[in-house]
Amino acid sequence: RQRQMCIRDRDMKTFPIGGVHPSENKLSRGSAVEPLPLPDLVNIPLSQHIGAPATAKVAKGDRVLAGQLIAEATGFMSANIHASVSGVVKAVEAVPNGQGMRQPMITIQREGDQWAEGIDRDPALKRDCDLAPAEILDRIKRAGIVGMGGATFPTHVKLSIPPGKKAEALIINGVECEPYLTSDHRTMLEHGEELLVGVTILMKAIAVEKAYIGIENNKPDAIAHLSLIHISEPTRRS
């Protein structure tokens, strides 16, 4: 049986009354995502996810490589954390976060651009995945992938189907929850192929035959773009 992703222009039911509908201020919707230069000093929180904070696996004075595991998940509801830069660990201590609250972080002084062994930096898109479902989930868990929403829910937990249960379909959330956000929009436009390949891999991971991508009607270009890719490359649906 062929797996299918559903990309349709379909109106969904909404609340009949009530709700708050703030004005959209998608000021950056037409601007491409650009990489920022690497900072000289980074503070990496040990809690970038809902659940238990990760446990630091490095100490002051250690040299680390980009992509290296520097903090390990503690329990099922937790997530691994990796170094975003190569350099020297300057401290493992509580540091004020963006909200002014102190939380444990690993501070790294950047030096060079060396990567951990086994990190695949080839930009070419790999469309084939011969991993078993359990292996896919293990890769996601080891990578420390979490949701980008406010809850930052560990992705391997989301994809863990309870024993005796079976999922009917995979739902991908392409809806932006705040008036100024455009990151989902730009991702669908700039990385549509990668997105659809990722969807097929997740479908395999949870053994479903259908996937739905939810996109707001204020993103007609994203809907058209993903639909075009989906139609022109049907092999990506299998």
PLM ranges: what are they?
Residues 5, 58-64, 96:
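Acidic, glycine-anchored pre-beta loop/turn
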Residues 59-72, 91:
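Short, well-structured beta-strand-loop connectors
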Residues 1-7, 229-238:
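Single conserved hydrophobic/aromatic residue that forms the stacking wall/gate
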Residues 77-83, 91-232, 236:
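Iron-sulfur-associated redox domains of electron-transfer enzymes in respiratory
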Residues 41, 61-64, 169-176:
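Active-site-adjacent bridging/hinge elements
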Residues 54, 60, 77-80:
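Short, conserved secondary-structure segments in the cores of folded domains
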